């Protein structure tokens, strides 16, 4: 979708590609499970307070505004943020990408009413050293799916030897644009400028 916009389900795209272009191996999903309102349990949070846990030197005790009026108390093991940070929060009842269901719990004798998330916990990257600090802007309580790509469908193709152009994402985008009449956006980067007065001559000859 970075290169071509289409408004049909990915299943229909897969069916059209399978008929006219190449073999479709499968459609898989990545990220937060999108079932039973689960995406609604992931929200933007604003850290109002953050300090050392009274019973654990390596934990932070945070008060996080998630748009409910009163902040939620959340215990976190990361230290790469502080008061004023905008963060990704999972509320009790949320199911994480790895299948874990988050529950309200006590950590070292203190209630934790949610979870502040890292990139890896959201399957957005491999960074697990700290939590995923968001850019300022989204209000507390904003659905996280409006800010981050929490759930994505992945189309896996088997490209045949006669279509090497489909080995790149842009080649797939060009094919989808042709099949569904979408506008193909330019590739990123600038085209090199020709220098000199002479234009290159290209000829194709049958052997």
Tell me what each language-model feature is.
Residues 1-207:
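Phosphate-backbone binding interfaces of nucleic-acid-interacting proteins
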């Amino acid at each position: 979708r970075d290169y071509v916009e289409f408004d049909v389900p990915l299943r229909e795209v897969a069916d059209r590609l399978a008929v006219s272009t190449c073999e479709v191996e499968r459609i898989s999903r990545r990220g937060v499970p999108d079932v039973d309102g689960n995406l609604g349990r992931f929200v933007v949070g604003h850290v109002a307070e953050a300090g050392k846990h009274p019973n654990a030197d390596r934990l932070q005790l945070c008060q996080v505004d998630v748009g409910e009026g009163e902040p939620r108390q959340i215990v976190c093991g990361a230290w790469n943020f502080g008061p004023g940070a905008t963060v990704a929060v999972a509320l009790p009842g949320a199911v994480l990408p790895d299948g874990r269901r988050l529950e309200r719990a006590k950590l070292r004798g203190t209630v934790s009413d949610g979870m502040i998330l890292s990139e890896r916990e959201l399957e957005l990257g491999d960074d697990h050293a700290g939590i995923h600090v968001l850019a300022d802007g989204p209000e507390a309580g904003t659905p996280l799916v409006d800010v981050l790509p929490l759930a994505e469908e992945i189309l896996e193709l088997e490209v045949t030897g006669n279509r090497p152009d489909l080995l790149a994402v842009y080649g797939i985008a060009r094919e989808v644009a042709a099949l569904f009449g979408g506008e193909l956006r330019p590739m990123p980067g600038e085209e090199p400028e020709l220098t000199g007065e002479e234009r290159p001559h290209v000829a194709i000859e049958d052997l």
